[in-house]
Amino acid sequence: PCAPTGLVLKEFRVTLHCGDYRFDPSLPVYLWVDPGYAGAYAVEVAQVKNDTIYIIDEVYEQGLTTEEVILVCETKEWWSKVIGGAIDIAGRQHQGMPSTEEIWKLKGRIILNSQSISVVDGIDRFRTFLKPDPITGRPHFFTNYNCRGLIAEMGGGVNPIQGLGMWRYKTDRTGAIFSEMPDDKNNHACKAAIYGLVDRFGLAGGRSAKATIQKFY
């Protein structure tokens, strides 16, 4: 079947990228985080094997604080194997109280890295992992079937949070895309994945994200 019109990550296919990819106790765990309250708070739980990413679980909730999300994470079987991760650079903002990044450090005892990433650069990096390897025919990014928020944002299913859907580009009445900047909605899990991919692998083409100026929204 054809991908929905205007889908940002049109390379994603449930039949190619989804499977029974469960927690491997022999590997460390990384948390890739996009904080949110009114939309969604996304925590993508990643393990890396031979430069291939496996999203083994996610916490995808609406209306929870960072402290509450940490409590949810602490109940998971993979929690004791978490060694770090990445978060939206906006997680550094204080606004008169501890930043989101600091709360993860204080309450969860986890250090999450953050850096400025442009929207287009972030999408390009994600696509390099979704595209099948020209030699093996397999991509370098897989997700467990239970990661419904991430799968839905990429166009592979119904979003578990009512009112949220797929991450799309702006299109005109004919369905033609008219901007390389997608809508800043329905992208919480995808942005979390981008923060993690760039933190671990840099930008596509071997560039460093630290040289970019534009924040990812």
Language model feature labels by segment:
Residues 182-205:
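Acidic, Mg2+-coordinating catalytic module of metal-dependent nucleases/exonucleases
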Residues 35-37, 89:
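Short, flexible loop/turn elements at secondary-structure junctions
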Residues 40-47:
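Short beta-strand scaffold segments in enzyme catalytic cores
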